[in-house]
């Protein structure tokens, strides 16, 4: 009787032992899947970008000045942006910048919203982007005004939270509240004419770091 009981228990336990031998780490699989998913879905990034803005033209009041040999408009900007990937194709965020435009010289500190869209599934690192914002601060040599960007970019991630960012686009910037004066050489008097706004159009070349 005892021999028959032992034989029955051995036969009943064999399928369970065989199942564990085939897949000994089955209980660990869900944890591994979660870890892999979290690694792939790192959705939040900080981007620090430098841009050189090659000025094409500028309008002040009713006068428009194009780029030429003696009037070489330029500019440098440093932008810090927080981006979040809502989907595999769409990202949005917000940022703040410190911009210096030259010839004529203007300083501005814009706060802006940033949007990216990745239309190519075969090249997920490539995207189109647009930014829209406003320069909040205004004082001597610092001007408020609207700003906007539109262009293409490429973000190459070397690690989970470190990569390179490249952008090429169009930059539109308004400088509001520019004081205008008229000088009369015959009398030596200067007359205040009021305040005007300048609008500059530029090609923007950008390089940055992604964290």
Identify the role of each PLM range:
Residues 1-40:
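Cleavable N-terminal export/targeting peptides
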Residues 30, 61-66, 133-136, 186-192:
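Extracytoplasmic loops and strand-loop junctions of Gram-negative outer membrane beta-barrel proteins
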Residues 37-58:
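Transmembrane beta-strand segments of Gram-negative outer membrane beta-barrel proteins
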Residues 50-56, 76-151, 156-164, 209:
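Gram-negative (and chloroplast) outer-membrane scaffold detector with strong preference
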Residues 60-62, 106, 176-180:
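Outer-membrane beta-barrel and related beta-rich outer-membrane complex signature
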Residues 63-67, 110, 145-149, 181-189:
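Flexible, surface-exposed loop regions and adjacent strand-edge segments
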Residues 197-211:
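Outer-membrane beta-barrel "beta-signal"
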């Amino acid at each position: 009787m005892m021999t028959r009981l032992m034989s029955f228990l051995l036969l009943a336990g064999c399928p369970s032992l065989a199942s564990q031998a085939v897949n000994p780490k089955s209980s660990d699989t869900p944890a591994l899947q979660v870890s892999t998913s979290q690694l792939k879905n790192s959705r939040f990034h900080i981007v620090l970008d430098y841009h050189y803005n090659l000025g094409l033209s500028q309008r002040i009041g009713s006068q428009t000045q194009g780029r030429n040999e003696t009037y070489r408009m330029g500019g440098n900007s440093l932008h810090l942006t927080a981006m979040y990937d809502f989907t595999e194709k769409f990202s949005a965020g917000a940022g703040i910048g410190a911009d210096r435009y030259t010839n004529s010289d203007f300083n501005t500190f814009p706060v802006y919203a940033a949007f990216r869209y990745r239309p190519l599934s075969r090249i997920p690192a490539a995207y189109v982007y647009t930014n829209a914002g406003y320069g909040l601060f205004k004082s001597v040599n610092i001007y408020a005004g609207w700003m906007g960007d539109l262009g293409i970019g490429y973000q190459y991630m070397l690690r989970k939270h470190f990569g390179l960012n490249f952008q090429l686009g169009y930059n539109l910037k308004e400088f509001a509240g520019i004081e205008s004066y008229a000088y009369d050489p015959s009398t030596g008097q200067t007359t205040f004419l009021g305040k005007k706004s300048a609008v500059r159009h530029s090609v923007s070349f950008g390089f940055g770091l992604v964290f």
